[in-house]
Each structure stands twice: as structure tokens, then as C-alpha cells.
């Protein structure tokens, strides 16, 4: 029996990669959380969460990045399960959760948070709790600052601007589905380490978005920043040549996502994306080099 065969009522959800097209650090709160302005899209590539009712709780992991996943209660997937069960009551059925781990760990594309968000959505349906997005987002925020963002991504997939510590969400119009290459050479960067390496925490916020069409979006991105990039490069200098490689392969725009070290590159069309992905994969065996498309803005 494979991990995705059903023995009873079950749900499978995509936990999409979260791509920070731009990330401005605008301050820091007294409790240590940084204030951020972020333009975020979600990719059609990601992890998958499969949950079914069972006789007892269980958690299993498969996939190319399964080996680095903690199986105990420290895992965000299990924290999400337990938080929702605490909210819904002790009579909720046991569940078997399977995580197909396709995204690199500690790579700046929201893998663990997206897994937890997909778990909240799947269990909300499986347990018939009927909690609205705001309630699920509040539960998610108790687990991590980027859970509300990732919950939006798993539920809707549409681009957004996130502010505050990541909990203030607003839709962005005009962003098309972007042919996008995600690349990681195996470098893992812990988000707290990158934030600790910041030398400047008071920066200008994002300018008003101007994203109608891919060319306009790329022009807009050139006016924005990833304020975590210098800190990430100080910890992992290999990020810089990776960005140069993506630009040399014909990317319209390339940048590091989030706290790194995954980089993204936007291409003009699917054929340019496919060609670049193949060349990079052939030249760099063992790299995570995955072609994808982001989900577009609401029509």
C-alpha cells in the first residue's frame, strides 16, 4: 500500500512553495519580531499533505527531502494537528498524516509553514469543524509568523502583500502566472541566523505595486529589495554566483527568496524556463532545480 492510497475518508492538499518576490525589513518590535513588507507569490510546486482517519494518530514522511524532517511533536505539521484538536475538542478522530517532502529544508520558500497550513485546511475539512479563514489564521499565527501567509497560499494561491510580522494580508491584482525556476544547491540557512546577521533593520517600505504584466512586474522588482540578501550572503557566499548563473541563463529577473538560500528566476515563457532548468540540472547534478509556474492574481 502506497502512502497515497486511501483506507477511509481522506484528503490530499498541495503545500505550495512560497516565493518572496520582494522583502523589505522596516523595523523590529519590542518582542524581537521583525516588521516586514513582502510581495509574495505561490508556486504550483510544493510538498503534499495526505490525511486520513485512522485507529490511532501517526505521522510518516517520504520524498527527496524526507531525511531531514523531525518526526516528533516539534514538527510544525504535528503542532498544527494538536492546535486544531485543542480548539475542536478531544472527541475528534485520530488521523494518519503523510508528508511528501519535495521542497528543500531551511531554504526560504516556506516549506514547513506551508505544510502546517495545508494540515490545518485538510483537518478543518476532515473533522468538519467549519472554521473560517480568520480563525484558522489565528491558530496558525500562534505557531509561526508566516503561517497566515502560507494558509492563504494553500487555500487560494493568489499573490499578496504581507505586512506586520507577516499576518496583515492584502491581495495584489495584475500578476500573471509566472514561468519561474526555483534553484537551491543544497545550502540550508536557518531563518533566525539570517535575521541575526542583519546590520540594518530600519528600511523603506515597499513602493506601491505596479504589476500589470510580466515586464512591468520585473521593472517594479528592480525598484524593490530583499533586505535579507546581504545577511544571507555573509553566511553563504555561494548565493551570489547562483544568481549570476540564473541571469546568464536568460532570466528576466532573479533574486533570493526570503531568508534563502533558494533563488528564483522569472522567464519570458515556458520554453525559456524549460531550457534553463535542463541546462542547470545537467550542469549541476544534485541541485534542486525545479521549473514551476506561480498562481496568478484573482481575475
Swiss-Prot record:
Q: Which residues cross the membrane?
A: none
What reaction is this protein's catalytic activity? Answer: 4-CDP-2-C-methyl-D-erythritol + ATP = 4-CDP-2-C-methyl-D-erythritol 2-phosphate + ADP + H(+)
The pathway noted for it is: Isoprenoid biosynthesis; isopentenyl diphosphate biosynthesis via DXP pathway; isopentenyl diphosphate from 1-deoxy-D-xylulose 5-phosphate: step 3/6
Some GO term, biological process aspect, for this entry: which one?
isopentenyl diphosphate biosynthetic process, methylerythritol 4-phosphate pathway
- Name any one GO molecular function: 4-(cytidine 5'-diphospho)-2-C-methyl-D-erythritol kinase activity
What is annotated as the active site? Answer: 18, 146
The protein's matches in InterPro entries, at most eight in alphabetical order, are given as: GHMP_kinase_C_dom (IPR013750), GHMP_kinase_C_sf (IPR036554), GHMP_kinase_N_dom (IPR006204), IspE (IPR004424), Ribosomal_Su5_D2-typ_SF (IPR020568), Ribsml_uS5_D2-typ_fold_subgr (IPR014721)
Protein purpose: Catalyzes the phosphorylation of the position 2 hydroxy group of 4-diphosphocytidyl-2C-methyl-D-erythritol.
By what name is this protein known?
A: 4-diphosphocytidyl-2-C-methyl-D-erythritol kinase
Amino acid at each position: 500500500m502506497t502512502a497515497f492510497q486511501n483506507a477511509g475518508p481522506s484528503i490530499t492538499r498541495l503545500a505550495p512553495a512560497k516565493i518572496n518576490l520582494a522583502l523589505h525589513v522596516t523595523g523590529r518590535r519590542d518582542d524581537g519580531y521583525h516588521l516586514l513588507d513582502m510581495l509574495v507569490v505561490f508556486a504550483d510546486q510544493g510538498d503534499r499533505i495526505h490525511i486520513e482517519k485512522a485507529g490511532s494518530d501517526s505521522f510518516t514522511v517520504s520524498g527527496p527531502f524526507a531525511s531531514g524532517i523531525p518526526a516528533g511533536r516539534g514538527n510544525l505539521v504535528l503542532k498544527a494537528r494538536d492546535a486544531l484538536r485543542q480548539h475542536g475538542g478531544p472527541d475528534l478522530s485520530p488521523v494518519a498524516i503523510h508528508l511528501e517532502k519535495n521542497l528543500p529544508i531551511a531554504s526560504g520558500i516556506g516549506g514547513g509553514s506551508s505544510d502546517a497550513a495545508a494540515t490545518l485546511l485538510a483537518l478543518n475539512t476532515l473533522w468538519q469543524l467549519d472554521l473560517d479563514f480568520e480563525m484558522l489564521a489565528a491558530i496558525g499565527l500562534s505557531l509561526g509568523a508566516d503561517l497566515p501567509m502560507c494558509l492563504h497560499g494553500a487555500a487560494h494561491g493568489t499573490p499578496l502583500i504581507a505586512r506586520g510580522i507577516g499576518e496583515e494580508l492584502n491581495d495584489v491584482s495584475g500578476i500573471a502566472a509566472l514561468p519561474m525556476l526555483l534553484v537551491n544547491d543544497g545550502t540550508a540557512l536557518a531563518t533566525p541566523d539570517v535575521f541575526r546577521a542583519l546590520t540594518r533593520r530600519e528600511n523603506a517600505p515597499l513602493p506601491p505595486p505596479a504589476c500589470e504584466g510580466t515586464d512591468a512586474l520585473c521593472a517594479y522588482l528592480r525598484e524593490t529589495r530583499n533586505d535579507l540578501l546581504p545577511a544571507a550572503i555573509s553566511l553563504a557566499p555561494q548565493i551570489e554566483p547562483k544568481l549570476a548563473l540564473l541571469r546568464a541563463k536568460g532570466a528576466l529577473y532573479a533574486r533570493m527568496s526570503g531568508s534563502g538560500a533558494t533563488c528564483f528566476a522569472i522567464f519570458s515563457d515556458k520554453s525559456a524556463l524549460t531550457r534553463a532548468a535542463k541546462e542547470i540540472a545537467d550542469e549541476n547534478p544534485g541541485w534542486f532545480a525545479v521549473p514551476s509556474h506561480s498562481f496568478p492574481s484573482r481575475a
